[in-house]
Curated annotation (Swiss-Prot):
It is a single-pass membrane protein. Belongs to the PsbK family. Keywords: Chloroplast, Membrane, Photosynthesis, Photosystem II, Plastid, Reaction center, Thylakoid, Transmembrane, Transmembrane helix. It comes from Daucus carota. This is Photosystem II reaction center protein K. The lineage of its organism: Eukaryota, Viridiplantae, Streptophyta, Embryophyta, Tracheophyta. It comes from the Eukaryota. GO terms for cellular component: chloroplast thylakoid membrane; photosystem II reaction center. The gene is psbK.
Amino acid sequence: MLNIFSLICICLNSAFYSSSLFFAKLPEAYAFLNPIVDLMPVIPLFFFLLAFVWQAAVSFR
């Protein structure tokens, strides 16, 4: 239980921290990657939600 709680805290903290504070800007050559970089902090949450979808698919055995 502690591991799941820790994972939730880490995911939420990383998503909140990185989306609320911007200290750096990508160089001009990589400006087209801005939408992908903005989405990257949310990716761990997708894995967390995938675990529930997977468990629902196997009927929470």
